């Protein structure tokens, strides 16, 4: 019995020794690779139970990380092929003057540590990335990104290639994403193409450029689904259809300081409001049955144009233009991004030339998804209404 116990103990000791040797080799390989790439690390630690890798105070010319923790798969260690399936990065910042850091947690399809060290990673399987900023960006602190496949190639000196398949951000499907980036030059640049599944040739392009402490983002697209666009922009879901858009954001020390948005939505609906049914109560117009048969709380439109700019936690709508078969509208307003409340003043006109001088002023307020409204019965509107009724009775 003692011999048996001694034999078992010897085998266990041999296995543990072998595993620790493997871990030591992994640790040495990591240290060598980091030194070759001019990445400074204060300490590298490996543990066996559970298999994990920890790096502290990582610094490069592009970013710094206070702590990186990686979880390893146990069995591949026997073959000298360490595989990772989880990464956590604490207090990551893009440069020393950045005033907004982030924590990133990743649950990934298992991949080889050798791939990571060679800067070419292939991921096959469902993966999740969660990014949480210390300070909100555009009213949001947390971003959840998922995908089924990925190719991450940072091996070239001047350009990185990043590809995602079946990607989604904050539960909004984005489809295929391809990014070309240069983070090593003084003027860091990135171009991302987003190709979602849609019933037309839709495409969005995200351009990023950073010079010193200031960065600029341009986000533009053609025939892009409005619902997905508004979800990405953290806007209330008030429209559907497809949109052409052009958006510019400026950041200083990673804080958003300026934003301009131009969005032209086409062939969609205003959700939660039936303007035609509302207007028919006040305009002396006999709309045909086809226009009034849709009694749901939506308004179909041909075009809906928004020109907005960002002011702290509010979006100021400088210009709102609406075109439907029966109505034309112009207006302006404010969207509170923190409370998702809207205050919009819209002037509605009939497309019927006989009533082109009659303007119905409406104020929408409260929750953007289900707003309340009031008609501004000004003296001017009363005179217009009286004149329109007289004209109709002639």
Where are these predicted regions, by residue range?
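Terminal hydrophobic membrane-targeting helix
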Residues: 15-98, 362
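Small-residue helix/turn framework positions
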Residues: 52, 57-59, 84-110, 127-137, ...
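N-terminal secretory/membrane-targeting helices
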Residues: 28, 35, 42, 99-119, ...
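Hydrophobic membrane-insertion alpha-helices, especially the h-region
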Residues: 5-19
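Extracytoplasmic/secreted proteins and extracellular or luminal domains
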Residues: 37, 61, 80, 122-123, ...
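Short, solvent-exposed mixed-charge patches
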Residues: 393-394
């Amino acid at each position: 019995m003692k011999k048996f116990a001694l034999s078992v103990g010897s085998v266990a000791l041999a296995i543990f020794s072998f595993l620790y040797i493997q871990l030591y080799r992994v640790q040495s390989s990591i240290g060598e690779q980091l030194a070759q790439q001019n990445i400074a690390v204060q300490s590298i630690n490996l543990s066996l139970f559970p298999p994990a890798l920890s790096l502290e105070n990582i610094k490069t010319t592009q970013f710094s990380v206070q702590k990186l923790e990686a979880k390893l798969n146990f069995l591949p260690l026997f073959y000298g092929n360490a595989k990772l399936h989880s990464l956590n990065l604490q207090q990551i910042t893009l440069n020393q003057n950045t005033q907004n850091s982030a924590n990133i947690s990743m649950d990934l399809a298992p991949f080889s540590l050798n791939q990571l060290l060679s800067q070419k990673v292939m991921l096959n399987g469902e993966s999740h990335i969660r990014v949480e900023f210390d300070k909100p960006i555009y009213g949001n602190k947390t971003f959840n990104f998922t995908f089924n496949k990925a190719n991450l190639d940072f091996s070239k000196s001047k350009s990185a290639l990043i590809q995602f398949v079946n990607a989604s951000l904050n539960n909004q499907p984005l489809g295929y994403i391809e990014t070309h980036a240069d983070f090593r030059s003084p003027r860091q640049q990135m171009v991302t193409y987003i190709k979602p599944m849609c019933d037309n040739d839709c495409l969005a392009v995200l351009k990023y450029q950073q010079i010193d402490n200031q960065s600029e983002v341009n986000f533009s697209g053609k025939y892009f689904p409005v619902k997905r666009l508004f979800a990405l922009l953290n806007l209330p879901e008030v429209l559907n259809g497809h949109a052409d858009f052009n958006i510019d954001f400026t950041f200083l020390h990673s804080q958003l300081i300026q934003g301009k948005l131009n969005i032209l939505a086409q062939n969609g609906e205003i959700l939660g409001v039936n303007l035609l049914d509302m207007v028919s109560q006040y305009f002396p117009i006999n709309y045909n049955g086809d226009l009034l048969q849709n009694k749901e709380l939506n308004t179909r439109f041909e075009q809906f144009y928004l020109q907005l700019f960002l002011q702290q936690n509010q979006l100021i709508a400088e210009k709102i233009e609406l075109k439907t078969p029966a109505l034309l509208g112009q207006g302006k307003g404010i969207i509170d991004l923190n409370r998702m409340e809207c205050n919009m003043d819209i002037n509605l006109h009939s497309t019927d030339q006989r009533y082109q001088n009659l303007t119905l002023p409406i104020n929408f307020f409260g929750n953007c998804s289900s707003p309340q409204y009031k008609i501004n019965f000004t003296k001017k509107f009363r005179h217009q209404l009286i004149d329109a009724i007289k004209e109709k009775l002639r």
